[in-house]
Structures are given as structure tokens and as C-alpha cells.
Amino acid sequence: YTKRKRGHPKDSIFWGEAGPLRNGKGSPYEAGYRLPCIVRWPGKVPAGRVNNAIFATIDFMPTFANLCGFETPEDRRIDGMDQTELLLGKRETGRDYFYFNNAGVRKGKWKYLKANAHFHGYAVEDGRKKVDELYDLESDLGETTNLAAKHPAIVSELRQLTEDISKWK
């Protein structure tokens, strides 16, 4: 309403603004998943450290369980992994990949989304072309350039990984 009546100042930032990231909550694009995680634990977690490793919210439980001296339950499958060494600065890498439920996978700098990727009902955008998508997140964090046609071997590898994980769950 306000925008129609008076407009918004140039460069207005709205609640939920994703900046240069594509889409938003409910989508497998970076604005739907990428969040900052700020950790402070003097004497344990190195101060001022910035790391872009893959660390998912499902990793908190096994990580904190380990830090507290507890075992993770063995009577059920725990999807998260212990990221204690990453958190404490003893390792620079996180998980090898991250699976986007019924959509695709991120491995290293690459993100693959399958042609029929599922978007939750509240996703900002689902008018996308129904084609395989591949993005280099190191050079294109906004996911603006689909590189699938230029890197068919990577698409094939990540498509297979997506299928394998889908069968496992």
C-alpha cells in the first residue's frame, strides 16, 4: 500500500531483506538457507574468525552434545554431524555437502538444483524455468548465472548425489 501511494526511499531495506541473495524463505536458493552464525566463547572459539564452511542447524545438537560430554542417541538416526573441530578453529572445512530436501545439493562451491526442485508454498519465487541449475557460489552468491550447460560433468555428479541421498532418507 505504502509503495503504491508514496513509494519507498531508494535502497529501502525491508524486514526479511536478503540483499544480493536470490529468493527467500521456503526456497532452496541462498536467501532461503544462508544465515550468519555468530559464536562467542572466549578462550575456546578464536575471536574475529570468519568461515564460510557448510554448517547446518542440524549440526548443533551433535556438536553441543560432544562439547558437553554427552553421546548422541544411537536408537535413532541423527542427520547432523559433530562440527566441534570447525567451531573451535581446529578445522577450516565443514560438511562435504548439504542436501536441500527434494530440490538439490550443495557440495563445496557448487550448488545444484534439479529441474523439478520443490519449493515450499511460501517461497517468494517459483516461476523459475524447470531446468537443471548449477551455480558457483564463490563467484555468484546471488545465483544469477546458471552454469549447468557449461559443466555437464558436475551436474551429473551432483544429480547422482541428490538421487542417492533421496533414496537414503
Question: Which residue stretches match the model-derived regions?
Answer:
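Active-site-proximal N-terminal segment of extracellular/periplasmic enzymes that hydrolyze or transfer
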Residues: 1, 145-153
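Catalytic cores of eukaryotic secretory-pathway lumenal/extracellular enzymes that build
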Residues: 34-35
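Short beta-strand-to-turn element immediately C-terminal to the catalytic PLP-Schiff-base lysine
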Residues: 38-40
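Glycine- and acidic
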Residues: 46, 143-144
